[in-house]
Regions:
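An N-terminal RHG(E/S)-centered segment typical of histidine phosphatases
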Residues: 1-48, 64, 68, 72, ...
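Acidic, low-complexity terminal tails and accessory targeting/binding regions
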Residues: 2, 88-99, 142-145, 163-244
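Beta-strand elements within well-structured catalytic alpha/beta cores of enzymes
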Residues: 3-7, 144-153
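Short active-site segment of divalent metal-dependent hydrolases/proteases
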Residues: 12, 157-158
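Phosphate-coordination/substrate-recognition cap region in phosphate-metabolizing enzymes
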Residues: 37-109
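Glycine-rich phosphate-binding loop signature in dinucleotide/nucleotide-binding domains
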Residues: 45-47, 136-148
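Short, well-ordered beta-to-alpha junction loops that form the rim of enzyme active sites
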Residues: 54-56, 84, 147-156
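Short glycine/proline- and acidic residue-enriched helix-loop micro-motifs
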Residues: 105-124
Length: 244
């Protein structure tokens, strides 16, 4: 059995300003840097055998700060930057305020499968997620030793991942899942999954949720998006879609 930590990046400038900024501009805020270091300290005794990050600077920086707090030593090139775990492109809502995007999402009935004009489709997102999962599966299945894998990615991308794992029952058995887990995680919160090796070519692969929305490391449970929802009654219907 191997372990995978799926982590949402720390708070970014865009999160703090409630703006959907271009990836190259959307760096971690001071709060985000602190969150990443706090998570690193929380996981300081975990030795990661493999480390993956989205190519966006807010994810790479989060990964670097997590590893900087570890008691283990890592090579400078330990982080594998993987474009398959980047955030979903939202088409005409790129560069718009989060409030505008949230209202548009509400108008769909809070449908996570919503495809805005010009956006990356759900099918396109799931295709790259499957490519990433196959690479992770190859790592898990190679050799006899347990792997411990860190994956730093994004809130919406993680929602798509959980939906995909739940729906593709011919490929994955997603154990210990609860419906209330299907919410956008706060910044630097994590899911810990236990993953079984495949026996030969047999499918499906078993994955079990060990920790959902892990937040023990956070000094405060306040979150930029939660504040936006709390301060705008017009966004009340989103309270069930985000971790409180």
């Amino acid at each position: 059995m191997s372990l995978i930590y799926f982590v949402r990046h720390g708070e970014s400038i865009g999160n703090n300003q409630h703006e959907n900024l271009p990836p190259e501009e959307n760096m971690l805020s001071e709060t985000g840097l602190f969150q990443a270091k706090q998570l690193g300290a929380h996981l300081e005794n975990v030795v990661f055998t493999h480390v993956f990050s989205s190519p966006y600077i807010r994810a790479i920086s989060t990964t670097q700060h997590i590893l900087s707090e570890s008691k283990a030593s890592y090579r400078d090139d330990v982080i594998v930057v993987d474009s398959d775990i980047r955030e979903r492109h939202m088409g005409i809502y790129e560069g718009k305020s989060i409030k505008v995007l949230a209202h548009a999402f509400i108008s769909t009935g809070a449908d996570f499968g919503w495809n805005p004009e010009g956006a990356e489709t759900r099918q396109e997102v799931e295709s790259r997620l499957e490519s990433f999962l196959r690479r992770i599966g190859n790592i898990v299945d190679t050799g006899s030793e347990q792997k411990t894998i860190l994956v730093v990615t994004h809130g919406a991308l993680m929602i798509h991942l959980w939906c995909y794992l739940l729906e593709r029952k011919e490929k994955y058995i997603f154990k210990n899942w609860k419906p209330e887990y299907l919410k956008v995680s706060k910044n630097t919160n994590y899911f810990l999954l236990a993953v079984e090796k495949l026996k030969g070519t047999a499918q499906p692969r078993e994955l079990e949720v060990m920790v959902a929305h892990g937040s023990e490391h956070l000094v405060t449970q306040k979150d930029a998006f939660n504040r936006l929802v709390k301060d705008n009654k017009s966004l009340d219907s989103l309270k069930n879609c985000v971790q409180q």
